[in-house]
């Protein structure tokens, strides 16, 4: 841990919700003499950590910001004109302050409960509309992790949808290098072959199920891709176009060119580069492919009154439903970044975006004219914002001169240089570039002779962003109010506890968020020279050391951009390990029936065959079934994927035995780290038999969920798997046996690592351990209070749960017809987000309070649940029919209380202000219960005027 001089202060006290007095009272309620006694009952003694964490004392908030300023000072955010899909951009201050820095936006969860998510669902609907308009395609999803993984998802979609039987995919030689590398990683375990070449000449002889084409190309060239797209389609394959959104304001859209799929990044729409992320990628498809689209899709439906309402559509496509049949494991997306990019488009409108694009292109054309005059005519005669020049033997000299001007260029191995201009480029930037090449010209002297580098037959003729939302909020006052109106519709952690099991919705402290927007962290290009990112590398080194101490592993990769991507990287490491030992035939992955849907989906993507292991009556892995299947598949056993504590909310007693069984049959143990919030400081996966885990930094380590992303899923491994961690073409320290990259950037979404770094630094060893203990206490307290009303389904042999618990209302459904959906929607009337519904056990609710919630908030939640149970008793007694009850009519809106006619058997007050809820601080749900079936039957995923649907519903 970093040395410090001042004594520790009390950040941990502010992070942990219950006071010492509250903890004592809660311990009495659960019947434990102390926190340590409770831990001894909740955790098996065989896994308890033998030595304490070695992280030192926690820093104060003032101290940690001073420390972060020192790290930031080690970074050098030069003007990076490297390109490759990353551009300098301006995040409008009104969006930075009111979305990126606003907990109403960044502390929200994924909008699975649409009634309390209408604000961000509308913002995502705007994002989808923006993508559809610019790409000219019919349906767009609500973001993916980055452009490279979006390309990999598109390849998988093409393979699934194509009528071609071949297993080869064509990759344009103009695709960004990191995209090609990620495509190789994705293709290899699935037995797919990549064919690279010039699509305008090489496609005729290629037998492929699809192709990805870069538009404009990585060199900057702008080509007419229509012949290539026609050639792909003539073979029965699918055409994927990786397109620059800003360029599409001036260029013919991929849809008009004939593409089936468009992918790319929305980073340059207001999202800082952040040394690699996070950024929102996109995917748009033609209408015929909409049911194969990976990730989340926002659609328009109606509520119980027929009022238009947004919701997540076609969820049966997603990994948590399809499981091992899924072709994608996408779970976390990049919602917060997609919202920022959509607001950037709302802020500028189509005219503003086109003006930015024209300015960038004018600077590019002027730069090209000057370079041509100097004898460095660009190799690409067409361009939007990027030029490639042959510098030959002068390459290093020019790079050095540019660096002295504060500019980074793209250095290519063939002696060429890439120059990618952006929104931040000004005339002085162009003049500085000329100086690097040896001239001292005035911009004005050259501009008049600059040609138009956009091909005339590729200039855009179709309108975009025609919906009123992209025209009505041009003044800051109007935009400010629009963003406030949307955030007021949502329920996030800034309003109330979000008790979602397996999601760890803990405090995202303000101090943890502050350095994120500092220029020294935000404005670094991921492929900038490493010496310009020394502050980041110091952070990486410290952070990895801390995670190793916390987990008991020997090596860490920070590259995965989500927990699901961490799973994928970990399984690839296992696959690489077996291959290196001459055991490539080991492809069976054992997965308990209770596993999160990403587990089987990730195994499928890694080329493994999923074999399901049963769970016993206690919810634990059935060890006898595990032993049977391990023996049955001993020759082919690759791994087991197991979550610990289990998804049933219990520390399984036989975890060491489970690991030993798998190891004894030649397999490796992948321990899903989704529930690591119950282990930090108490137990370490690397000590009790696990070989690899991912860590959800957006759960245990305080990166906010952002309404559905960003996330981070670094993986820890034991020493024998370390050589197989993901590499990256941009860094040269990877081992020869490293698997390929799983993310576009070498360190994933590096900028948000600052959040988790600060959390660990402020909590220190004792604070982190106390957080874990209180998380377990809070869950046991809720279990104790609710069990007389809603039975707790699973406990360990000593009657304890881990950091979450499952309550079981299924008997009540059988008796009264009340569903978990009814309970979830009724909780909204009490001002709460619902617990996790029907996972891992259908018809149940899984509750995780985290350590950050106070006893008062826990009691408020328990009181609400008990009051709901009393309402169910009214149905049991026959005083209400379920169809006429407040549970079935929930959530109640302001429209309900204002109804002239009230014919329900309960009063307005009972419906809208249920027992124990506050009238003065009431959260009013903006819509009634959303009709999911209607939304899927009448799929609308981008916006004509919303009023059209209101009229249609009447």
Swiss-Prot record:
The keyword Oxidoreductase applies. The keyword Oxidoreductase applies. It is an enzyme of class 1 (oxidoreductase). The modification N6-(pyridoxal phosphate)lysine is found at residue 699. Its EC number is 1.4.4.2. Keywords: Oxidoreductase, Pyridoxal phosphate. SUPFAM superfamilies: PLP-dependent transferases. InterPro entries: GcvP (IPR003437), GDC-P_C (IPR049316), GDC-P_N (IPR049315), GDC_P (IPR020581), PyrdxlP-dep_Trfase (IPR015424), PyrdxlP-dep_Trfase_major (IPR015421), PyrdxlP-dep_Trfase_small (IPR015422). One of its GO terms (molecular function) is glycine binding. It comes from the Bacteria. It catalyses: N(6)-[(R)-lipoyl]-L-lysyl-[glycine-cleavage complex H protein] + glycine + H(+) = N(6)-[(R)-S(8)-aminomethyldihydrolipoyl]-L-lysyl-[glycine-cleavage complex H protein] + CO2. One of its GO terms (cellular component) is glycine cleavage complex. Its cofactor is pyridoxal 5'-phosphate. GO terms for biological process: glycine decarboxylation via glycine cleavage system. Belongs to the GcvP family. The glycine cleavage system catalyzes the degradation of glycine. The P protein binds the alpha-amino group of glycine through its pyridoxal phosphate cofactor; CO(2) is released and the remaining methylamine moiety is then transferred to the lipoamide cofactor of the H protein. The glycine cleavage system is composed of four proteins: P, T, L and H. NCBIfam families: gcvP, PRK00451.1, PRK04366.1. This is Glycine dehydrogenase (decarboxylating). It comes from Nitrobacter winogradskyi (strain ATCC 25391 / DSM 10237 / CIP 104748 / NCIMB 11846 / Nb-255). The lineage of its organism: Bacteria, Pseudomonadati, Pseudomonadota, Alphaproteobacteria, Hyphomicrobiales. The gene is gcvP.
């Amino acid at each position: 841990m970093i040395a410090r001089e001042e004594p520790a202060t009390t950040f941990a006290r502010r992070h942990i919700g219950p006071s010492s007095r509250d903890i004592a009272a809660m311990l009495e309620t659960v019947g434990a003499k102390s926190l340590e006694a409770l831990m001894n009952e909740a955790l098996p003694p065989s896994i308890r950590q033998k030595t304490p964490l070695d992280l030192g004392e926690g820093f104060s908030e003032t101290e940690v910001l001073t420390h972060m300023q020192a790290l930031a000072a080690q970074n050098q955010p030069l003007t990076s004109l490297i390109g490759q899909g990353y551009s300098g951009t301006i995040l409008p201050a009104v969006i930075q302050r009111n979305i990126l820095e606003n907990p109403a936006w960044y502390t929200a969860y994924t909008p699975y409960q649409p009634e309390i998510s209408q604000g961000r669902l509308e913002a995502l609907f705007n994002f989808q509309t923006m993508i559809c308009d610019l790409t000219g395609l019919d349906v767009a999803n609500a973001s993916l992790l980055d452009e490279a993984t979006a390309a990999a998802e598109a390849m998988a979609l093409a393979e699934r949808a194509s009528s071609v039987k071949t297993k080869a995919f064509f990759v344009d030689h103009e695709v960004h290098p990191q995209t090609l590398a990620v495509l190789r990683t994705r293709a290899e375990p699935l037995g797919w072959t990549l064919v690279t070449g010039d699509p305008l000449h090489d496609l005729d002889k290629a037998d492929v199920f699809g192709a990805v084409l870069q538009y404009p190309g990585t060199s900057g060239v702008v080509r007419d891709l229509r012949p290539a797209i026609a050639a792909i389609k003539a073979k029965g394959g699918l055409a994927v176009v990786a397109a620059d959104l800003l360029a599409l304001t001036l260029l013919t859209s991929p849809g008009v060119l004939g593409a089936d799929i468009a992918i790319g990044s929305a980073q340059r729409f207001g999202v800082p580069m952040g040394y690699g992320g996070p950024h929102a990628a996109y995917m748009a498809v033609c209408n015929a492919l909409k049911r194969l689209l990976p990730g989340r899709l926002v659609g328009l439906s109606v509520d119980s009154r027929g009022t238009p309402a947004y919701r997540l559509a076609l969820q049966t496509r997603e990994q948590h439903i399809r499981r091992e049949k899924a072709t994608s494991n996408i779970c976390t997306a990049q919602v917060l970044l997609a919202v920022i990019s959509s607001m950037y488009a709302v802020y500028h409108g189509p005219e503003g975006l086109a003006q930015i694009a024209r300015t960038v292109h004018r600077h590019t054309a002027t730069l090209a004219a000057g370079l041509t005059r100097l004898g460095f005519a660009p190799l690409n005669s067409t361009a939007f914002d990027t030029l490639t020049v042959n510098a030959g033997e002068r390459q290093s000299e020019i790079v050095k001169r540019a660096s002295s001007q504060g500019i980074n260029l793209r250095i290519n191995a063939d002696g060429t240089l890439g120059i990618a201009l952006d929104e931040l480029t000004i005339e002085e930037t162009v003049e500085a570039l000329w100086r690097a090449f040896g001239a001292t010209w005035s911009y004005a002297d050259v501009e008049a002779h600059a040609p138009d580098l956009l091909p005339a037959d590729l200039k855009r003729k179709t309108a975009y962003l025609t919906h009123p939302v992209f025209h009505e909020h041009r003044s800051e006052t109007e935009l400010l109010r629009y963003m406030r109106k949307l955030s007021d519709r949502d329920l996030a952690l800034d309003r109330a506890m979000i008790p979602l099991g397996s999601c760890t919705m803990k405090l995202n402290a303000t101090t943890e968020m502050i350095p994120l927007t500092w220029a020294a962290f935000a404005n670094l290009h991921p492929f900038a020279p490493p010496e310009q990112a020394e502050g980041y590398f110091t952070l990486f080194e410290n952070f990895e050391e801390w995670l190793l101490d916390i987990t008991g592993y020997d090596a860490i990769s920070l590259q995965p951009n989500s927990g699901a991507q961490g799973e994928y990287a970990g399984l690839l490491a296992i696959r690489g390990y077996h291959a290196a030992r001459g055991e490539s035939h080991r492809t069976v992955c054992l997965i308990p029936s209770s596993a999160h849907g990403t587990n089987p989906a990730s195994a499928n993507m890694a080329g493994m065959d999923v074999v399901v292991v049963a769970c016993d009556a206690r919810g634990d892995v059935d060890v006898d079934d595990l032993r049977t299947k391990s023996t049955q598949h001993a020759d082919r056993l690759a791994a087991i994927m197991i979550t610990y504590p289990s998804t049933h909310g219990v520390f399984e007693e036989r975890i060491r035995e489970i690991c030993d069984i798998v190891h004894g049959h030649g397999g490796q143990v992948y321990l899903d780290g989704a529930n690591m919030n119950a282990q930090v400081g108490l137990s370490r996966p690397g000590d009790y038999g696990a070989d690899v885990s991912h860590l959800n930094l957006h759960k245990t380590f305080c990166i906010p969920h952002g309404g559905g992303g960003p996330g981070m899923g670094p993986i820890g491994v034991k020493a024998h798997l370390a050589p197989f961690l993901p590499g990256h073409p941009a860094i040269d320290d990877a081992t020869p046996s490293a698997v390929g990259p799983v993310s576009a950037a070498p360190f994933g979404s590096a900028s948000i690592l600052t959040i988790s770094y600060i959390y660990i630094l402020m909590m220190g060893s004792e604070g982190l351990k106390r957080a874990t203990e209180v998380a377990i206490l809070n869950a046991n307290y809720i279990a104790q209070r609710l069990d007389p009303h809603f039975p707790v389904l699973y406990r360990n042999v000593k009657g304890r749960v881990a950091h979450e618990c499952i309550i079981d209302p299924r008997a009540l459904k059988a008796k009264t017809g009340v569903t978990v959906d009814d309970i979830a929607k009724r909780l909204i009337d009490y001002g709460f987000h619902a617990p996790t519904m029907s996972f891992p056990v259908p018809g149940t609710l899984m509750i995780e309070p985290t350590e950050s919630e106070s006893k008062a908030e826990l009691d408020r939640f328990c009181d609400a649940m008990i009051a709901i149970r009393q309402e169910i008793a009214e149905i049991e007694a026959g005083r209400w029919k379920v169809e006429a009850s407040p549970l079935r009519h929930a959530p109640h809106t302001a429209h309900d209380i204002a109804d002239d006619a009230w014919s329900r058997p309960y009063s307005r007050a009972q419906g809208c202000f249920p027992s124990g809820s506050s009238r003065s601080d009431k959260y009013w749900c903006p819509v009634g219960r959303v009709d999911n079936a209607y939304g899927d039957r009448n799929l609308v995923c981008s916006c004509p005027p919303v009023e059209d649907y209101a009229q249609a519903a009447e």
